[in-house]
């Protein structure tokens, strides 16, 4: 049974490899994997999308065992930096979509509750990212100011 106020809804998903070792079928060197990651990022893919593409199209289950570095660390080393962490950005986009829906359908109470849940997650993540230093201490979640991220 799914956990309440989470978006999994009991769906089955793929499982990460149990032992993060380099599989025997991988033909790529660590340098080639790094180049693939950087190339995909420059083409506009988010880190999670890069991982999916590497898994599905190149047969690379995990980047870290091969390169010894996390995918986002590789991107930082090559000067590719994201304004906001990806999970926070996706939640903000979801909240903005719900707000747009509520402008057209103001009596949709289920969506209003959904917006409350999403914004609660946003506030928890903002607190966490401020604490670990990924967001500046003066960052404030403001839907109107962040509306440019809805694209």
From Swiss-Prot:
CDD domains: Ribosomal_S15p_S13e. Gene3D superfamilies: 4.10.860.130, S15/NS1, RNA-binding. GO terms for molecular function: small ribosomal subunit rRNA binding; structural constituent of ribosome. Residues 1-16 have a biased composition (Basic residues). One of its GO terms (biological process) is translation. Keywords: Ribonucleoprotein, Ribosomal protein. HAMAP family: Ribosomal_uS15_A (MF_01343_A). Belongs to the universal ribosomal protein uS15 family. PANTHER family: RIBOSOMAL PROTEIN S15P/S13E, SMALL RIBOSOMAL SUBUNIT PROTEIN US15. This is Small ribosomal subunit protein uS15. It comes from Pyrobaculum aerophilum (strain ATCC 51768 / DSM 7523 / JCM 9630 / CIP 104966 / NBRC 100827 / IM2). The gene is rps15.
């Amino acid at each position: 049974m799914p956990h309440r106020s989470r978006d999994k809804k009991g769906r089955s998903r793929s499982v990460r490899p149990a032992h993060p070792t380099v599989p025997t079928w991988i033909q790529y060197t660590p340098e080639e994997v790094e180049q693939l990651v950087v190339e995909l990022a420059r083409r506009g893919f988010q880190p999670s999308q890069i991982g999916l593409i590497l898994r599905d199209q190149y047969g690379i289950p995990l980047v870290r065992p091969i390169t010894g570095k996390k995918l986002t660390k590789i991107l930082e080393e090559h000067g590719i930096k994201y304004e906001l962490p990806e999970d926070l950005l996706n939640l903000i986009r979801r909240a903005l979509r719900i707000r747009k829906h509520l402008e057209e359908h103001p009596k949709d109470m289920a969506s209003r509750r959904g917006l409350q849940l999403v914004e609660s997650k946003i506030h928890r993540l903002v607190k966490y990212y401020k604490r670990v230093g990924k967001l500046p201490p003066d960052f404030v979640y403001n839907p109107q100011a962040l509306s440019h991220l809805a694209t």
